[in-house]
Amino acid sequence: MGFVKVVKNKQYFKRYQVKFKRRREGKTDYYARKRLIVQDKNKYDTPKYRLIVRFSNRDITCQVAHSRIEGDKIVCAAYSHELPKYGVKVGLTNYAAAYCTGLLVARRLLKKLGLDRLYEGLKEANGEEYYVEPADEGPNAFRCNLDVGLMKTSTGARVFGAMKGAVDGGFNIPHSVKRFPGYDAEAKEYSAETHRKHILGLHVAEYMRKLEEEDEDAFNRQFSQYIKLGIVADDLENMYKKAHENIRSDPKRDRKPKKDVSKEPKRWNAKKLTNAERKQRVVEAKAAYLKELQGEEMES
């Protein structure tokens, strides 16, 4: 069939159907979303969970959610801005921080469900291929699928660092090693040591040493926060190892203290008077005026 020009006449506009709002905004891939949320028809009212990973300029968000008619329900969430509590105060958007955030959301949700003792995951981050095994007695491991949104799923992407952290934390997520750092597509071989370096921030440490030797001004500019906090390249591995231990020991989220609502809120405009208050103000104004007149008469 040849090229047919679209005639935008009355019939065209009468039948025109707009796409979903988030498709028009370019925020949601509904082709992928449909396959992530549609559950098997023989699993009645069984949620299909997703590990949602999103990156911003200064933060990493990891959420476990499932879909409902009224909208997605967030079961648990973790953010990289929580990592300073566990000892990681810089580099909150790199691969190592993504791994820590994924580990945090996994341990937090398993603790919430009471499965943290049953499924401890991989305690030492070594980059090896790991899949959680179901326990002989008790419930199965928590299963979810990775939701990357509109991100490119290239080999070594940070989104897979968050997924690896969640898997090592005890989640059952279907995956392979083909997208992890250290996988060679030509040789079809996986280097766990390369992946381990990324998990523990050793690739950042190597770049710090290299940049400091080649261009000190660029080093001072790019790693100013590291310098301010006194963190050198040799400290990174121990910093991330301690963070993993701290996350496992206490994944619970700190609740913000409730605001004291007993105090009256500050007003930026005059309070509206009631009818009785307005009448009383008129009476007071009349009395003051009469008193002033009497005072003038006495003087005269």
From Swiss-Prot:
Keyword tags: Cytoplasm, Nucleus, Ribonucleoprotein, Ribosomal protein, RNA-binding, rRNA-binding
GO biological process, one term: translation
Any matching Pfam family: Ribosomal_L5e
A GO MF label: structural constituent of ribosome
Region (Disordered): 246-276
Domain of life: Eukaryota
Ranges of biased composition (kind: Basic and acidic residues): 246-267
Gene3D superfamilies listed in its UniProt record: 3.30.420.100
Single GO cellular component term: cytosolic large ribosomal subunit
Annotated compartments: Cytoplasm; Nucleus
Entry keyword Lyase: no
Family stated for the protein in its record: Belongs to the universal ribosomal protein uL18 family.
Subunit structure: Component of the large ribosomal subunit (LSU).
Functional description taken from the UniProt entry: Component of the ribosome, a large ribonucleoprotein complex responsible for the synthesis of proteins in the cell. The small ribosomal subunit (SSU) binds messenger RNAs (mRNAs) and translates the encoded message by selecting cognate aminoacyl-transfer RNA (tRNA) molecules. The large subunit (LSU) contains the ribosomal catalytic site termed the peptidyl transferase center (PTC), which catalyzes the formation of peptide bonds, thereby polymerizing the amino acids delivered by tRNAs into a polypeptide chain.
Protein known as: Large ribosomal subunit protein uL18
Lineage per the UniProt record: Eukaryota, Metazoa, Ecdysozoa, Arthropoda, Hexapoda
